[in-house]
Amino acid sequence: MATITVPVNSKPFLKTLNALGGRKAGAAIDILEPIYLDSTTDPADPVVKVADSDPAVAATSDVIGIAVTKAETGSQCVYAYTTGDVIDFGGSLTVGDNYWLVGSTIDNAYSSITALDYVVKLGYCNEDGDFVVNIIVQGEVK
């Protein structure tokens, strides 16, 4: 099991030229955290928050993207959401590994997903050691 950790002072950047999403954060969000759209608090002004695979609130596992900037509550969060987006953040990932939503983190071990938590694939590591966005919300629990 290896949870993705962003090196200190890392400034992730996209190696692809796809559009990025941007929306107001409803809570603090860190770089490379999976996010979901919270429209229950204020349906007229939905915000993004850190996703979670906990089955108690299914909507929190409906991942829409991976944060590429830090955001405080009320500030803008920029995120990658297009399948195939390549994020280089200066970390060392294992080529070929798949990455999953485990609680509110990104982890490369499917076995780390707790029984009855939602199964969400977030991406994989390409041959250059970069994170590639490939979000698949399976809509089922483990």
Where are these regions (language model features)?
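Glycine-anchored, exposed beta-strand/edge motif detector
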Residues: A2-K142
